[in-house]
A protein has these predicted regions:
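Conserved helicase motor core of SF1/SF2 NTP-dependent helicases
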Residues: 1-136, 141-149, 154-184, 195, ...
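C-terminal/domain-terminus segments
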Residues: 215-234
């Protein structure tokens, strides 16, 4: 066991069943440390995303990850959060934003557009096509293609990185997903649903290196209030 090295981020646990190292005979309590230098995400995006989770995140083994004190090595524009009146307005806003990134000379494969589930993919396709941006919809292989923007659900976005990310359809009852909330009766299970939905939005936000746009059709997700607080502080 002394030859094993593990790296992870408790904030990126997006599936409901918690994973326990201890149950596999690996006890990392007192043998771990938190890394506080972020080389991938701008200060502005990291600050926004971290406020979704709070200052500490714990796992089922009792390990706590301290999120305060982390610093990014570069700055960027503040994340943009827009709540629109209908799908058409959202599509137009996202298309304009995508065109701006292309006009800056950003390659298409440096752009990602993500939604909560397949149901909302129509909105992402419409915005990308309105911007005349070539794209590919990611499958379970999660392979990006040079010259094409990537469209996918937030779950498939985990592990990817883009210079610019648009998160669409962050509406009420979409994130957190209403069907998941209604499927549980126990308060502990309900808390776990909310936590994993928050983590999912965190993962989606932190796919962005430099530019982040988050849009919803009113009423927006309750999580957007946390994001707006973060944006106001940057």
């Amino acid at each position: 066991m002394n030859g094993l090295f593990f790296a992870g981020d408790l904030g990126q646990r997006i599936f409901q069943l918690p994973f326990s190292w201890k149950s596999l005979g690996v006890d990392i309590r007192g043998r771990s440390r938190t890394l506080h230098i972020n080389y991938r995400t701008s200060h502005q995006i990291r600050m926004q995303a971290d406020l979704l989770l709070g200052p500490d995140v714990s796992d089922v083994d009792g390990n706590t990850e301290e999120r305060r004190g982390t610093v990014s090595v570069f700055n960027g524009p503040a994340p943009a959060i827009r709540s629109l009146v209908d799908d058409d307005e959202e599509i137009a806003v996202v298309a304009t934003w995508l065109k701006a990134r292309m006009n800056e000379g950003m390659p298409a494969h440096e752009i990602g557009i993500f939604v909560r589930s397949e149901v909302e993919m129509t909105r992402a396709r419409a915005a990308t096509e309105a911007a005349a941006l070539p794209y590919r919809v990611l499958d379970e292989k999660v392979e990006t293609t040079v010259g094409f923007a990537s469209l996918s659900t937030m779950h498939l976005a985990k592990g990817l990185e883009f210079r610019a990310v648009s998160l669409m359809a962050c509406d009420d009852e979409i994130i957190p997903l209403q069907s998941r909330i209604e499927s549980v009766a126990d308060s502990a299970d309900l808390e776990e649903v909310y936590n994993t939905e928050r983590h999912l939005l965190y993962v989606a936000c932190t796919r962005a290196r430099d530019h982040l746009l988050i849009t919803s059709v009113e009423p927006g997700s309750e999580f957007l209030e946390d994001l707006r607080v973060a944006s106001a502080k940057t």
